[in-house]
Curated annotation (Swiss-Prot):
This is Probable tetraspanin tspD. It comes from the Eukaryota. The gene is tspD. Residues 42-65, 112-200 are extracellular. It holds the Pfam family Tetraspanin. It is a multi-pass membrane protein. The lineage of its organism: Eukaryota, Amoebozoa, Evosea, Eumycetozoa, Dictyostelia.
Length: 230
């Protein structure tokens, strides 16, 4: 394999630096996506605080968005370090960079896979069960906050039989707002789109990261063979 590598490290480190710049930008995208998801899914923490929520809802409201945000920040730091060690041809630094990127790749695949799993699962049914349990309890104020945030009224048509409009947002004249806009449609669409975005971003970044890892490994081999590392 080694004989097919470029004769000088330059032809390996330049693509590696370019890939790290691309990954830095994608890391910034992850931070933005993570920030949006933290703000959005934090609304479901109120369901968690009043008790009785499933593990799926706990995961998408806390661990998943926080994980995406953390990975994005770590990605940005690591890719800057990758550019530096590649430019200076520091073999030890490249080894640590490769190990950390490999760990990050595994975590990224895990979070991306988790997001796509929840996207394909019927998470709406689990939200519905918790929603309706809370609607008719002494914690119904949580539903009022969620309906105000999502600009909807009643979870679905079946709620209309149970006078769900009593919890719907109202204007200054006590008129019901968003009547006919059911929360199931709004929430299910918003949750699914964000989960799909996280999963797709994880897969796309994982592919580019894998290519970057290959260039880093080839550069390590070339530096070792040429004894040019310091």
């Amino acid at each position: 394999m080694v004989e097919y590598l470029p004769s000088t490290p330059r032809y390996l480190k330049v693509p590696l630096i370019i890939l790290n710049v691309i990954l830095w930008l994608l890391g910034l995208v992850l931070v933005i996506i993570g920030g949006i998801c933290v703000g959005f899914f934090s609304r479901f923490k109120e369901l968690q605080e009043v008790g009785g929520v499933s593990e799926s809802i706990k995961s998408i409201s806390v661990s998943l968005p926080a994980g995406v945000l953390s990975i994005g920040i770590f990605f940005m730091v690591l890719t800057v370090a990758g550019c530096i060690v590649a430019y200076k041809e520091k073999m030890v630094g490249l080894v640590f960079y490769t190990i950390l990127m490999l760990v990050l790749l595994v975590v990224l695949i895990g979070i991306g896979g988790e997001a796509l799993t929840y996207h394909n699962a019927d998470i709406g049914i689990e939200i519905e069960d918790n929603w309706k349990n809370i609607s008719y309890s002494n914690q119904s104020v949580v539903i009022k906050k969620l309906e105000q945030f999502f600009e909807c009224c009643c979870f679905d048509e079946s709620d209309l039989k149970l006078n769900c409009t009593a919890l719907c947002p109202q204007d200054d004249q006590k008129n019901i707002l968003y009547n006919g806009t059911f929360c199931y449609d709004v929430i299910f669409g918003a949750v699914n789109s964000k989960l799909y975005l996280v999963g797709s971003a994880g897969v796309a970044i994982g592919v580019i990261e894998l290519v970057s890892l290959m260039f880093a490994l080839f550069l390590i081999v070339r530096l070792y063979k040429s004894n040019s590392y310091r």
